[in-house]
Amino acid sequence: MTILKTKELKIIQRLAKVKKSIQAVSYEYSRFDAIDNKNIYEIKCREKFYDKVLIEFDKYSFNLIYAQTFNKNFLYVVEMDKIYIFNISKLYMFDYNFNWEWKDLPNQTEFNKKEKIKKLVGYIDISQAIYEINK
């Protein structure tokens, strides 16, 4: 039983056309949304287009170490005007500058929680996408 939101599940279904073995994770507290034999996937849906997508350091660091430990790639999938796929493992390997900074952001974006906390975040230029899928 997966607890992913409908939008994330639709993105996984779209990715399954290219990544045949992709599966949504079913563990409620997983720090990533999908997995296959070579990759783990963190999926984000954004209402607006950004030329630099935001990634939270806690997701970045955990998923990067998890991927390295289990010999996988960490792919960050962001839906905006298109679906953009970033290989975070490769960006790390090539010393990509994420321009990490502390920002006041909502504690959770779901459930309309307005409380803000400081989060360490970085940015990925969309030119770094390894793959794009039209909506």
Model-derived regions, located:
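Catalytic cores of nucleic-acid endonucleases
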Residues: 2, 21-24, 45-92
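Conserved catalytic cores of phosphodiester-cleaving nucleases, focusing on short active-site segments
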Residues: 34-49
